[in-house]
């Protein structure tokens, strides 16, 4: 044991001697300590062992899926060891340098110079680093940052632009992180104070980062983007492009969380009309094309947020998506949890997405006309413009800042004008109060403003009052409290009608409101009457939807008797006075009235005797053409029951016209006779008056010779006037007589010509009928005789060749002679019958003519009846057989059938006679 210990000690002493080289001798003790610490520190050895251990593992490729985390931990541990060693080394060195034993003047001077150089280098670094570093450097308080910016005189310099960029980045990031439903309007105002055109990359990055960190506030960020997009569409487009790229990146990497956040943001942007619905349908199609559990989960989350909007704008697309989900549920092998998610999605759709509205309450902040929708497909290539996230020097920095200030002022002034209508109304009231000024004499002068400048805000207040009311009574109360002057009552009524017309569908609220105003004051009722006439005259200017709403509102006013039915006086139904728009208005108007009142009540109202003068244009009876047009119109719109009286009038119109003509003729004839008698009496009276006047003149001349010449001249003038009036009346009476005589002569000639033409037609028809009968009868007989001869000849040759007698031949000869004699008698009877018929017709015609000339003053209907009776008599006297059979046959077809049957019987009898004659002929006997 001792020998071993001595050997170890000896070996260690020997090693010490070898290690103590001249180089070690030249080094100072402090340097040797440092060398020893560096070479023999256990931390260094430990670090080298660990690194060697890591290298061995890297050679074996022993890393699993968590290798990145292991590397991260090892790097952190290595950094920690290095920092610890550096601190330990610095501590020891300071300790040795500060010891008085080892301090030398030369070394102290060297060390002092080194420390001074290090301090100056640190100061230089501190001057450069705070702002120009990559991450922005250390935190600089805002006051100090403003002071630093004020110290820089050149605002186009790199340092100033860098400072403003850092301030812009911090303010945008802070505002985006603070936004919520309650303060979004204030945040928008503060954001617009910053130059978001220059920092659009920073803004889009901040919004996407904030949404990814807190997806529960996605609807708030979507509303923020929608407001910014309405003023700066390029910023909204940039955010949407980056969202699409994030979704595609997450889909490629199978990053479910990134897909969920980005798809949810896209859904809310579509609800705010920033993104188009085609993008959403493409994303859903991509997710469900090759379904997995994660892709189905992302699709269902996306559908919950955008399903209600897609149902409205693209029902076919959403139906296809749900059909695909149903197919996946039934056919695919998916996890039970995902199956439950699909079933829940169908339940949400069945409930109408009531828990997932399109835009939550308080976030519908963009007007429809200000919205800007971007049509960006999913598969296109987009540039995310990441350069905008990094600072870049702008050579025209101050010019761009001034441009943005002008743009900001314009946007903020516009927003203030839209958000403060009440302030404008208040200022207008103040201006009205200031209109009352005083003269220099102290008298008060009232200035009336007739420029109607205040009419526009009053229209705005009316519209706001109407739209903010829950029911019509509250609205009427609000409008009456505004104290409109009488000159603006019609304007108020027009405003109510315009609000009703602008609705998508008719709302009964406006009809009830207008009815309430009509019941309150007569002026409102008269205003609505005038508006009805104006609207009907200019109905062609309205669109179909507005026309329908206006018609339904006026129908409500008429049904409730808020305005009188006399307003229908302006409606004239005819082909010339109506247009397509007016016919549509009348159609909707009366259909609404029939729906309110019912067809019987409406018909009774239209038949009201007191209102008939106002319905003359609506139900015209002046012209059969207009009457027929009105009947066809009401029948085509399903209200034919209103035209029963018009139909009766149209049926009886010819009769009424004839009776009116007859009355006119009789009145003309009576007036002519009266005028004759009056003319005779006038002539007698004129002669007697002339005689009396002459006698009076003579007496006056004899008695009073002192009459003045003026009175004589007056008398002469009056006499001349009387004579001229008598002549004019006589001429008129003569003209009337001549016209009446011409009319009566024409009518007589027309009646004669009509009767003659009718009688000639009847004669011709009868002659042609008799000729046809005779010719057909003879043709039948000849044909039958030829056929019978041939058939009898064959029959006789076969069966009766040996049976013939002379007696039969003689009988047949005599029978043939008798038959010829009968035929000649028939022809004579026919000729005699036709002559008798002609004579009877002439006699009846002469009787008819004498009767017609005798009863000339009877009506037109009596003449037609007598003419028809005489025609029937003449026709009935045509043949005795027809007189006997007339009580049996009423139809002409039956008479013809009997006639043909009679001819067929004659044909059979003649055939039998011919057969017998041929059989018993002497030629056959031979």
UniProtKB/Swiss-Prot annotation:
Keywords tagged on the record: mRNA processing, mRNA splicing, Nucleus, Spliceosome
The keyword Nucleus is annotated on this UniProt entry: yes
Protein localization: Nucleus; Nucleus speckle
Domain of life: Eukaryota
InterPro entries: ARM-type_fold, CWC22_splicing_factor, Initiation_fac_eIF4g_MI, MIF4G-like_typ-3
Basic residues composition bias: residue spans: 729-740
GO terms, biological process: mRNA splicing, via spliceosome
Domain annotation MIF4G: ranges: 169-352
Molecular function terms from GO: RNA binding
Domain (MI) ranges: 457-573
Transmembrane portions of the chain: none
Composition skew (Acidic residues), residue ranges: 413-441
Signal peptide: none
Region annotation (Disordered) ranges: 1-77, 91-135, 412-450, 658-926
UniProt feature, compositional bias: Low complexity: 667-676, 684-705
Primary role: Required for pre-mRNA splicing as component of the spliceosome. Promotes exon-junction complex (EJC) assembly.
Subunit and interaction comment: Component of the pre-catalytic spliceosome B and the catalytic spliceosome C complexes. Component of the minor spliceosome, which splices U12-type introns.
Protein family (similarity comment): Belongs to the CWC22 family.
Record's protein name: Pre-mRNA-splicing factor CWC22 homolog
């Amino acid at each position: 044991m001792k020998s071993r210990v001595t050997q170890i000690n000896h070996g260690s002493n020997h090693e010490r001697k070898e290690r103590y080289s001249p180089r070690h001798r030249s080094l100072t003790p402090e340097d040797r300590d440092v060398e020893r610490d560096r070479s023999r520190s256990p931390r260094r050895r430990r670090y080298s062992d660990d690194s060697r251990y890591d290298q061995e593992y890297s050679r074996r490729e022993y890393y699993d899926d968590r290798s990145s985390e292991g590397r991260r931990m090892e790097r952190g541990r290595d950094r920690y060891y290095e920092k610890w060693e550096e601190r330990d080394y610095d501590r020891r060195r300071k300790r040795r340098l500060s010891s008085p034993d080892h301090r030398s003047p030369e070394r102290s001077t060297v060390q002092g110079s080194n420390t001074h150089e290090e301090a100056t280098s640190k100061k230089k670094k501190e001057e450069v680093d705070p702002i120009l570093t990559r991450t922005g450097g250390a935190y600089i308080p805002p006051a100090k940052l403003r002071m630093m910016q004020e110290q820089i005189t050149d605002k186009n310099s790199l340092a100033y632009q860098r400072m403003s960029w850092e301030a812009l980045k911090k303010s945008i990031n802070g505002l985006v992180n603070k936004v919520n439903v309650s303060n979004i309007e204030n945040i928008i105002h503060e954001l617009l104070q910053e130059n978001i055109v220059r920092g659009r990359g920073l803004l889009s990055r901040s919004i996407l980062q904030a949404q990814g960190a807190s997806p529960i506030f996605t609807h708030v960020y979507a509303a923020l983007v929608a407001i910014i997009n309405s003023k700066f569409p390029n910023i909204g487009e940039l955010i949407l492009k980056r969202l699409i790229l994030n979704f595609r990146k997450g889909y490629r990497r199978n990053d479910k969380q990134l897909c969920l956040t980005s798809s949810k943001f896209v859904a809310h942007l579509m609800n705010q009309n920033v993104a188009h619905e085609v993008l959403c349908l493409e994303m859903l199609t991509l997710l469900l094309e090759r379904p997995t559990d994660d892709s189905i989960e992302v699709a269902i989350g996306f559908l919950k947020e955008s399903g209600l909007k897609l149902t409205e704008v693209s029902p076919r697309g959403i139906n296809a998506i749900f059909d695909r989900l149903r197919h996946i549920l039934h056919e695919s092998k998916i996890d039970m949890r995902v199956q439950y998610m699909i079933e829940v999605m169908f339940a949400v759709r069945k409930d109408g997405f009531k828990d997932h509205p399109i835009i939550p309450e308080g976030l519908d902040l963009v007007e429809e006309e200000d919205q800007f929708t971007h049509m960006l497909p999913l598969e296109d290539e987009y540039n995310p413009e990441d350069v905008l996230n990094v600072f870049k020097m702008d050579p025209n920095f101050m010019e761009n800042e001034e441009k943005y200030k002008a743009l900001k002022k314009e946007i903020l002034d516009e927003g203030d004008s839209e958000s403060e209508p009440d302030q404008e109304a208040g200022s207008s009231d103040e201006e009205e109060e200031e209109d009352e000024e005083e003269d220099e004499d102290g008298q008060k002068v009232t200035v009336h403003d007739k420029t109607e400048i205040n009419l526009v805000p009053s229209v705005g207040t009316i519209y706001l009052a109407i739209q903010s009311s829950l029911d019509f009574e509250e609205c009427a109360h609000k409008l009456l409290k505004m104290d409109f002057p009488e000159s603006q009552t019609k304007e108020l009524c027009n405003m109510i009608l315009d609000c009703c017309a602008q609705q998508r569908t008719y709302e009964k609220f406006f009809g009830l409101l207008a009815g309430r105003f009509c019941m309150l004051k007569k002026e409102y009722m008269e205003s609505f009457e005038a508006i009805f006439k104006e609207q009907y005259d200019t109905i062609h200017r309205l669109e179909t939807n507005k026309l329908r709403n206006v018609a339904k509102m006026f129908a409500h006013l008429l049904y409730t008797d808020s305005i009188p039915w006399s307003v229908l006086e302006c409606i004239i139904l005819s082909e010339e006075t109506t247009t397509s728009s007016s016919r549509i208005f009348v159609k909707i108007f009366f259909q609404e009235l029939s729906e309110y009142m019912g067809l019987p009540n409406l018909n009774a109202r239209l038949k009201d005797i007191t209102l008939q003068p106002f319905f003359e244009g609506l139900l015209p009876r002046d012209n059969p053409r207009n009457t027929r047009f009105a009947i066809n119109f009401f029948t085509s719109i399903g209200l034919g029951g209103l035209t029963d009286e018009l139909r009766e009038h149209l049926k009886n119109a010819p009769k009424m016209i004839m009776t009116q003509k007859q009355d006119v003729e009789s009145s003309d004839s009576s007036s002519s006779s009266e005028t004759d008698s009056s003319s005779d009496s006038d002539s007698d009276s004129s002669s007697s008056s002339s005689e009396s006047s002459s006698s009076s003149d003579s007496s006056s001349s004899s008695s009073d010779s002192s009459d003045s010449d003026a009175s004589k001249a007056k008398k002469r003038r009056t006499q001349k006037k009387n004579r001229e009036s008598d002549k004019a009346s006589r001429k008129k009476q003569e003209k009337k007589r001549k016209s009446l005589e011409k009319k009566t002569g024409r009518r007589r000639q027309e009646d004669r010509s009509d009767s003659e033409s009718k009688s000639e037609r009847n004669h011709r028809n009868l002659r042609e009928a008799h000729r046809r009968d005779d010719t057909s009868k003879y043709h039948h007989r000849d044909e039958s005789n030829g056929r019978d001869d041939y058939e009898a000849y064959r029959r006789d040759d076969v069966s009766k060749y040996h049976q013939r007698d002379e007696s039969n031949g003689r009988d047949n000869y005599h029978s043939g002679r008798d038959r010829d004699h009968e035929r000649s008698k028939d022809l004579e009877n026919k000729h005699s019958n036709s002559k008798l018929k002609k004579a009877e017709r002439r006699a009846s015609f002469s009787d008819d003519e004498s009767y017609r000339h005798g009863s000339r003053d009877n009506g037109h209907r009596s003449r037609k009846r007598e003419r028809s009776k005489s025609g029937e008599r003449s026709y009935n006297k045509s043949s005795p057989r027809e007189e006997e059979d007339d009580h049996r046959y009423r139809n002409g077809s039956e008479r013809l059938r009997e006639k043909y049957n009679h001819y067929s019987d004659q044909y059979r009898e003649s055939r039998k006679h011919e057969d017998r004659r041929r059989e018993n002929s002497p030629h056959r006997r031979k």
